[in-house]
Every structure is written in structure tokens, then in C-alpha cells.
A protein has these predicted regions:
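Divalent metal-binding segments
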Residues: 1-200
């Protein structure tokens, strides 16, 4: 393989050489991502609502649309929320997600993957109340005025909630892997390291 200007490559080609004229486009090596959550990202693209909207109202609207498609006890899941990309420049709250549903549990993950947002029904299912101490390795967000839970869940405090989420079927895992593989390939990634896998 040789890359360069046409004048620099003159005379290098043989009878079986394939010549590509990229017409001024840039050639780069395949990218390597040494820390990515391949499987879980693929699964979320299949099971969760994309929360990359400009306003919290728009995000709530997307979640409401999903809630209307699900049964009354089905978890409504969202992902890719980023407070810094919204007009409001704030976190989602329990009140925001209660507007999605008071009967269906709702959970949304932050784009960074270390903060989660839930509604009152989700807190009730897990057994979190205003008197619940912070779980080991995490924090329960609270209203600074009265100490009540505001629906923001930090780090490992989400683990008790995860135990209540629906199981992911092998079919969804496979579909998610196929989807994320195509997305990574389209972005130019040729090698990745999944930073968290399970025995499943």
C-alpha cells in the first residue's frame, strides 16, 4: 500500500494494483476505542428512548409517546440525556418524569453513564423513601429545602433499581450488537474494547 500525491506514486503500480482517487478526501487509519460499552450501548439503542432533545419538555414528550405504546406496568427507559445540551441547563427531576407516567416506572440515564433519573413509581417499586440512607457507593439526590428525594440517582445507588428492570433477551442482545457494530463501522472504528461485560 502507498499513499501520497499522484506524482509521488508514479511508477509504483503493477498489473494487479488497485488505484483509488479519493478526489481530495482525507485518509486516516482505523480508529481504536479503548473504553466503550459496546453491548450495553447497542441494547439501549434498541430498548430505550433517545433523550438527546433540546428541551426537557421535548424529552418528556418522547418518553410519553413510548409510555403510550407500553403496558401499564412496563418500565419506560431513556438514555443519552445531557443536561448541558438542553435549554434549561438542569437535570431531569422526579416531577419531570412523573409527567411521563404516575403508574409506569420511568428511568433515564445520563450520557456519561454515572447519573440516573427516575419517577415516583420507580422509587416506590424499589422501596426508596425520603428516609432511605444513601446506598453503598452511591447517592440519592434530595431537594435541598426539605430533604425529599428528587429522583436523581448517583453511581451505584442505581443497583437496586437495575434489579427490577426487565431482562434482556438473547434476541435483543444480538440485535443491539448488530446495530452498534454498524454504527461503529460507519464512524471509522475498527477496534474496540468493551469496558464492561457480563457472563450473559
Amino acid at each position: 500500500m502507498a499513499v501520497g500525491k499522484e506524482s509521488e506514486l508514479a511508477g509504483l503500480e503493477g498489473p494487479h494494483t488497485k488505484v483509488l482517487d479519493l478526489e481530495g478526501l482525507t485518509v486516516v487509519p482505523g480508529f481504536i476505542d479503548a473504553h466503550i460499552h459496546v453491548l450495553s450501548s447497542g441494547i439501549r439503542h434498541i430498548t430505550s428512548v433517545d433523550c438527546t432533545a433540546d428541551t426537557i419538555r421535548a424529552i418528556v414528550s418522547r418518553l410519553q409517546a413510548r409510555a403510550c405504546q407500553e403496558t401499564s406496568d412496563q418500565w419506560i427507559q431513556g438514555f443519552m440525556f445531557d443536561d448541558t445540551k438542553t435549554e434549561e441547563q438542569r437535570s431531569l427531576t422526579r416531577a419531570d418524569l412523573d409527567a411521563v407516567s404516575l403508574f409506569q416506572p420511568v428511568i433515564v440515564s445520563h450520557r456519561a453513564g454515572h447519573v440516573y433519573y427516575v419517577n415516583s413509581r420507580a422509587l416506590e417499586i424499589v422501596g426508596f423513601s425520603d428516609r432511605t440512607p444513601d446506598p453503598s457507593g452511591g447517592l440519592l439526590g434530595r431537594d435541598p429545602t426539605d430533604g425529599s428525594l428528587n429522583g436523581v440517582i448517583y453511581e451505584r445507588a442505581v443497583e437496586p433499581i437495575r434489579k427490577h428492570l426487565p431482562l434482556v433477551t438473547p434476541e435483543v442482545r444480538q440485535e443491539g450488537l448488530r446495530l452498534i457494530d454498524s454504527m461503529l463501522t460507519k464512524a471509522g472504528l475498527t477496534s474496540v474494547h468493551d469496558a464492561m461485560v457480563s457472563n450473559d
